[in-house]
Amino acid sequence: MDYIKGFTYGWMARKGDFLKPEAKESLRLLQERTGTTHVIFALAALQDTPQSTSIDYTGQHIVDDEELIDMIHYARSLGFKTILKPTVNVKDGTWRAHINFFDLDVPCEPKWRDWFASYTEYQEHYAVIAQATGCEMYIAGCEMVQTERRADEWRQCLAKIREHYHGPVTYNTDKYQEGNVSWWDAVDVISSSGYYPLGDWDNQLDRIEKIIAPFNKPFFFAEAGCPSRTGSSQIPNDWNLEGDVNLKEQADFYMDMFDKTSRRQWVQGFGLWDWRHLLHEEADAVNNDDYSVYGKPAEKIIKEFYIK
């Protein structure tokens, strides 16, 4: 597998957003300013609550097929390799890791089989698009921790995806959960979210290496990043953490992550989090405390690492 010098793009894009000239300019700037070679198009379908069994991927909350296909073609015209990553959010704000149902079916209660039927239909829809547009990889969702114990349903879902998409397939498990997935044999690439504290990377890499070694499959961090906020380098997954804007702390996180992972040949890339399809003004970077690296010191650190 080629080393993935990747960035997640377009997260939470709504219908019509990819039609805006600013969205294509953002994608061009991603390449120019970071040296990124792989762009991950992350899509967010919606379900009403963690116990809802119907997934909506056709509303105003998500780009439509035509604009997605057009943007993938545009990315490829720029020379990007493309990865499609459809996942799901919960409309009431609950994190998708808490999507959950009874292990044994109970009459009149929502059931795993109904949720997986809807989720698999959703995945099949985008697997067709990934195949038609020549995407180099397909990520069958991310960080759905409670679902991961349902190995049989996940195997069936992945098998249905493969009926439509014939390239490498992965699933993006959450930080610290690499050992929770018993069905890594059913994917081509193992991936997880690399939101690990600055200073703890060696410990986490030692742990992950022992878990994935028996599977003998490529591995990359399908997500990794850190807000530019005081305290975020110690809990980079917490997007709600309160703290002052701190561009240096974000830069230090990236330097540490790249330094430690570059010493492990089995780490074969990143899908950094994240590059917005509608960028803030570059002059506003000094006041921006989220995951964006646009116009911040971390942006230069990423480019130096990606182009070497």
Predicted regions: what they are:
Residues 10-17, 52-65, 105-120, 141-148, ...:
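The substrate-binding groove and active-site-proximal loops of carbohydrate-active enzymes
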Residues 15-32, 116-129, 174-183, 251-260:
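Short, acidic/polar
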Residues 16-31, 56-77, 121:
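Aromatic- and glycine-enriched glycan-recognition loops and surfaces
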Residues 18, 260, 264-308:
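Aromatic-rich peripheral "rim/lid" segments of glycoside hydrolase catalytic domains that contact
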Residues 36-52, 66-147, 276-278:
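Substrate-binding cleft and catalytic face of glycoside hydrolase catalytic domains
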Residues 81-88, 92-93, 137-149, 155-179, ...:
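Aromatic-lined carbohydrate-recognition surfaces of secreted/lumenal glycan-active proteins
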Residues 123-142, 173-203, 218, 222-230, ...:
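Aromatic- and acid-rich polysaccharide-binding/catalytic face
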Residues 194-195, 214-252, 272-289:
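Active-site clefts of carbohydrate-active enzymes
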